[in-house]
């Protein structure tokens, strides 16, 4: 329990930030899930659209400080690699 007015305010601010961060993180998870589903279906057009959407969502999360920029970069890189794998297999 906060003892001072400033501690109460910091608690309110932390709760607001946490709610916002949870919302952003949920959006990232949803975008990644949609991309993985598109990859599993094997449709290149859907996969590319989902990849673009996921990259945008992850980039925004990194710019807001919800994800570390290196973690976001790593996540985007791995998703792009996973999205490219079926296309490369189809080209062979």
Curated annotation (Swiss-Prot):
Organism: Anaeromyxobacter dehalogenans (strain 2CP-C)
Any single biological process term in GO: translation
GO function terms (MF aspect): small ribosomal subunit rRNA binding; structural constituent of ribosome
Name by which UniProt lists this protein: Small ribosomal subunit protein bS20
Spans annotated as Disordered: 1-28
Family: Belongs to the bacterial ribosomal protein bS20 family.
InterPro entries in the record: Ribosomal_bS20, Ribosomal_bS20_sf
GO cellular component terms listed in the entry, alphabetical order: cytosol; small ribosomal subunit
Keyword Manganese: no
SUPFAM superfamilies registered for this protein in UniProt: Ribosomal protein S20
Pfam family, one: Ribosomal_S20p
Function: Binds directly to 16S ribosomal RNA.
Gene name in the database record: rpsT
Family annotation (PANTHER family): 30S RIBOSOMAL PROTEIN S20, SMALL RIBOSOMAL SUBUNIT PROTEIN BS20C
UniProt KW keywords: Ribonucleoprotein, Ribosomal protein, RNA-binding, rRNA-binding
